[in-house]
Amino acid sequence: MEPIGRSLQGVTGRPDFQKRLEQMKEKVMKDQDVQAFLKENEEVIDQKMIEKSLNKLYEYIEQSKNCSYCSEDENCNNLLEGYHPKLVVNGRSIDIEYYECPVKRKLDQQKKQQSLMKSMYIQQDLLGATFQQVDISDPSRLAMFQHVTDFLKSYNETGKGKGLYLYGKFGVGKTFMLAAIANELAEKEYSSMIVYVPEFVRELKNSLQDQTLEEKLNMVKTTPVLMLDDIGAESMTSWVRDEVIGTVLQHRMSQQLPTFFSSNFSPDELKHHFTYSQRGEKEEVKAARLMERILYLAAPIRLDGENRRHP
């Protein structure tokens, strides 16, 4: 059997191998970043080190070094995905160290924010809402901004704060505002959940059959910051009012957990909605008790403006 060393000598001594090696070396030495690195370290790097580290230098030039050609929508092609290489001198060799790239940091931050902002049955296009997109020319929006600013300050300092009950005509941007508040919280690394109430109620009714009702209720009861979107649009029954909404709000009130609401109804109109069940039963005391919880948790602000969904 031919010794391995002699076999390797045979391969490396072949003309085609030597040609490829020279082409690789030429490509490496023409690279501007490599040239700059060698010049910067010319006192410690000699030709022998370059020859010894040729494979590392080639690995370096074949990768994106500054993410200038990367897109957030593309997969990273680097050896270590999401990291860019930097040449370093390591003893008598040239080596590569990898650093997290700006694009990866940004995407990781976005994923973290998305994980903090949970939603149930909310349109996906609304979940990217920010206050930078909000028209503040309307006085009602200025009042809302002031309250949100005060809330964030209080929540940051104490973990508590009074939410908002946003009400107004269909399409004036109430859900958008809730999503913007949730994103603002996520930027500060606070968790929240937005729930579209009518669909949530329908799911809870179905959960009576698969015995997941308590689990779903507890998730909404205990989330750090809750936003109930379109309260009052659900089909009103005594069970919905007392066992679902009432139970959730009682827990959140007792634990002082911040809660936000949006509705097409003013507080008085919502009270009327909760007074009458589908059967026509009139229960003013229970409706009043529920409204007390809502107004304890949230300050009412009317949002004015045109219908922004259908110009």
Curated annotation (Swiss-Prot):
Q: According to the UniProt entry, what is the EC number of this protein?
A: 3.6.4.-
Which SUPFAM superfamilies does this entry report, sorted A to Z?
P-loop containing nucleoside triphosphate hydrolases
> What does the entry list under GO cellular component?
cytoplasm; primosome complex
Q: What GO terms describe the biological role, i.e. biological process, of this protein?
A: DNA replication; DNA replication, synthesis of primer
Q: Which class of enzymes does this protein belong to? A: hydrolase
The reported effect of residue 101 to A is: Partial loss of Zn(2+) binding, still interacts with helicase
> Mutating residue 84 to A has which effect?
Loss of Zn(2+) binding, no longer interacts with helicase
Could you say what the effect of mutating residue 67 to A is? Loss of Zn(2+) binding, no longer interacts with helicase
**Do you know which Pfam families this protein is assigned to?**
Bac_DnaA, DnaI_N
Query: Which reaction equation describes what this protein catalyses?
Result: ATP + H2O = ADP + phosphate + H(+)
What this protein needs as a cofactor is: Zn(2+)
Question: Cellular location of this protein?
Answer: Cytoplasm
UniProt note: phenotype after gene disruption: Essential, it cannot be deleted; in depletion experiments DNA replication slows as soon as the protein is degraded and replication stops by 1 hour.
Q: Which residues form the signal peptide?
A: none
Keywords from UniProt, A to Z, are: ATP-binding, Cytoplasm, DNA replication, DNA-binding, Hydrolase, Metal-binding, Nucleotide-binding, Primosome, Zinc
According to the record, the residues making up region (C-terminal domain (Cd)) are 137-311
| Induction remark | Transcribed at constant levels during exponential growth.
Q: What is known of its domains?
A: The N-terminal domain (approximately residues 1-136, Nd) interacts with helicase DnaC and has a Zn(2+) cofactor. The C-terminal domain (approximately residues 137-311, Cd) has ATPase activity. The ATPase activity of the Cd (not whole protein) is stimulated by ssDNA; Cd has a cryptic DNA-binding site that is masked by the Nd. The CTD binds both ssDNA and forked DNA.
Q: By its UniProt entry, which PANTHER family does this protein fall under? A: CHROMOSOMAL REPLICATION INITIATOR PROTEIN DNAA, PRIMOSOMAL PROTEIN DNAI
What this chain does, per the entry, is described as: Helps load the DnaC replicative helicase onto single-stranded (ss)DNA and simulates the helicase activity; in the presence of DnaB more helicase activity is seen. Regulates DnaC helicase activity, at low concentrations stimulates the DNA helicase and ATPase activities of DnaC. Has no measurable ATPase activity after 1 hour incubation of 6 uM DnaI with or without DNA. Another group has found the protein has weak ATPase activity that is not stimulated by ssDNA.
Q: Which family does it belong to?
A: Belongs to the DnaI family.
Report the protein name in the record. Answer: Replicative helicase loader DnaI
Query: Which organism's genome codes for this protein?
Result: Bacillus subtilis (strain 168)
Query: Gene behind this chain?
Result: dnaI
